[in-house]
Amino acid sequence: IPVLEDAEPMATGPFTPNWESLKTYEVPEWFRDAKFGIWAHWGPQCVEGSGDWMAREMYMEGTYKYNYHREHYGHQSEFGFKDVLPLFKAENWNPDELVKFYKEECGAQYFFTLGNHHDNFDLWDSQYQEWNSMNIGPKKDILDGWARAAKKAGLPLGISFHADHAWTWYEPSRRFDMK
């Protein structure tokens, strides 16, 4: 599936977008026995500390996130989400230490992490777009760090993608962020 006419096609997998194909999926054996896992829902939406829908709700007048952003960063037309992204630096992030803690202290039997939130910011070195953690913010492949840490700890890894709202996620920003 080409993203653009001259672009490299996206990788395809064993499934097609229909129910019959999805029914052929077999749940991994480890998952049947795993009773507890940790999901790290962490990315640039955490910069402000106001919640995971920050990139959308910071543009919705009257919401807590809108008011929080105005108070701490100024008007959204002058400092929008694109300006928040470079503040996501992950300078104190230690995936080995965190995953070890999740397993040994919390009892996690698997680890999931966020690959891309509704904000369309890829947490890996994406070949399909420049809005990713290698080009903006931490300059690190966050997914690779989590994957290596999970493997080192012997935990199965899952990655979640939240593209369901991607097409309409930034609609509230159109009145503010003109760049």
What do the predicted segments below correspond to?
Residues 1-179:
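Mature catalytic domains of secreted/periplasmic carbohydrate-active enzymes
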